Amino acid sequence: MSSDFNFTAIDFETANWNPASICQVGLIRIEGGEVVHEVNELVQPPKNEYYIKNIEVHGIRPADTLDAPGFDVVWHEHMKRFIEDQVVVAHSIGFDANCLRHTLAWYDEVQPVFEERCTLAIFKRGLAYLSKKYKIPLNHHDAHSDAMACAQLYLIHLRKLNAPKTGSLFE
């Protein structure tokens, strides 16, 4: 299988308006079209400060992350090697890449270089709609579930791109 089938899907939930307030990390590493690594971690956002609107979206509360590690710990232990110099996919990559950059800056971490891909730009529909259409299980606004759905969508896209072409103008 092509190296195109090697990528990392990510999703973050945030505690408040600040993009550096990641409170849950979802990461799915795909190699050769198969899941080889998963991360589903609650992380304590800076000051463990939450806004009610964010809680209403994902259901994560300050008590849930009170004893959770900081993002920097999760980054080094579970994420960095799957992001740096890799293809990174998200459903709305602009949001997730922005959160990653702001959160790493908060911790004075070096910014990774990676190639961005966006399933929202590819499919032009919301994650809930697409998950239903393609029969992908989804617990929407759970970072792990959203990252897994994104990974499955990107695999669908790659398989379509790599499908043998039938018919020819010259037949």
Predicted regions and their residues:
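Conserved beta-strand -> loop -> alpha-helix junction used to position metal-binding or nucleic-acid-contacting
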Residues: V110-F123
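Non-catalytic, well-ordered alpha-helical scaffold segments
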Residues: A97-N98, R117, M148-A151
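Active-site flanking residues adjacent to catalytic metal/cofactor-binding acidic residues
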Residues: I10, R117, S145
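Acidic two-metal-ion nuclease catalytic site recognized across multiple nuclease folds
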Residues: M1-S3, A151-E171
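Metal-dependent de-N-acetylase/amidase catalytic core
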Residues: R125-R159
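A structural signal for alpha-helix termini and helix-coil/disorder junctions
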Residues: E84, W106, R125, I156-A163
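Conserved non-catalytic scaffold segment of RNase H-like nuclease domains
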Residues: S2-A97, R101-W106, V113, L127-H141
